[in-house]
Every structure is written in C-alpha cells, then in structure tokens.
C-alpha cells in the first residue's frame, strides 16, 4: 500500500509539472522536468520568448528563430530557449545549427529531457539511428517511469526502423 501511495504521488507530481510546462510555466526543472534546472529556473521569460512559443504552436519556424535568437542574446543560460531554437532549426532542415543548439541546451542542463528527445529526432532526420538510440537510452536513464519524451522518441525510432529496414547481409 505504501508503494502504491508513493507511485501515485510521483505520478501526480509529474503530471502537475507537465501541465505547468505545457502552460508556459517557467523552467520546471529544465524543459519538461529535465533535472535540477540550474540557473534556468531563475530566468524570466520575456516577450521574445513568449512570442517564440506562440510561433512554435503555429509552426512558424522562421519567427521562432528570429524571436528566440533575440531572447538568447540576452539570456544565453536558458536551456529551454536553446532547445526550442534547435527544434526550429531542425524543422527548417538546418540540422547543423540544430545540433549546435541542442548541444548548448545540454551543456547548460545535461538532463534536459526535451533536448535529448529532439536531438534523437534530429539524428533520425540525419539518418543516424545509432545516435538516436543512444539518446533513447539516455532518456530511459533520466525518466523514473517512461516519460513522454522517452515514449515519443521510442515511437520515432520504431517508425524509422520500419521505414528503413536493414540491408540483407550476404
């Protein structure tokens, strides 16, 4: 019974954190509860950040890039911002810049689950299944229970494998 209560409390905490993050509720541990959050939790999200996140919802990737670049000039220690910037560059097909920005996010917050998920998706986009699977293993170690980021990347890896079967060996 005690274990059930502990699990229920953890799930409740995870859900409330996810809801706060989805509503734009600050650092939340660095992008979906990525870890300790570090200095990121003290960053005040300004008009550029908020406009960029509206643009994310509208899939206006060029606007995300413009507004988030302006934001990170003033707030270079915000892992969430670097992650979203990488996301936008990935969506426009600029994988080189996306990889650099995901790297910046993970340097700030090595446990940033959203950055690990998006980095794995970028590796799949680049055709690098091995590195995508490495990000999946990292997410597996970061998530207490299977988290959203792990589940989404796992589904993307599964889809990639079904669309790119291994070549037959001789």
Model-derived features with residue positions:
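Start-of-helix register in tetratricopeptide repeats
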Residues: 46, 80, 97, 114, ...
């Amino acid at each position: 019974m005690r274990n059930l209560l502990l699990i229920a409390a953890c799930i409740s905490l995870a859900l409330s954190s996810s809801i706060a993050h989805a509503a734009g509720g600050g650092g939340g541990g660095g992008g979906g509860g990525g870890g300790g959050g570090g200095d990121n939790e003290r960053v005040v999200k300004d008009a550029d950040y908020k406009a960029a996140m509206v643009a994310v919802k509208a899939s206006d990737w060029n606007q995300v890039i413009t507004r988030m670049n302006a934001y990170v000039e003033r707030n270079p220690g915000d892992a969430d911002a670097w992650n979203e910037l990488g996301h936008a560059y990935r969506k426009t097909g600029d994988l080189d810049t996306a990889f650099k920005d995901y790297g910046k996010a993970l340097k700030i917050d090595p446990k940033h689950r959203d950055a690990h998920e998006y980095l794995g998706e970028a590796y799949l986009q680049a055709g690098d299944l091995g590195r995508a699977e490495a990000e999946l293993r990292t997410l597996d170690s970061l998530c207490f229970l299977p988290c959203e980021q792990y589940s989404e990347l796992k589904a993307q890896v599964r889809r990639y494998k079904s669309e790119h079967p291994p070549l037959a060996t001789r």
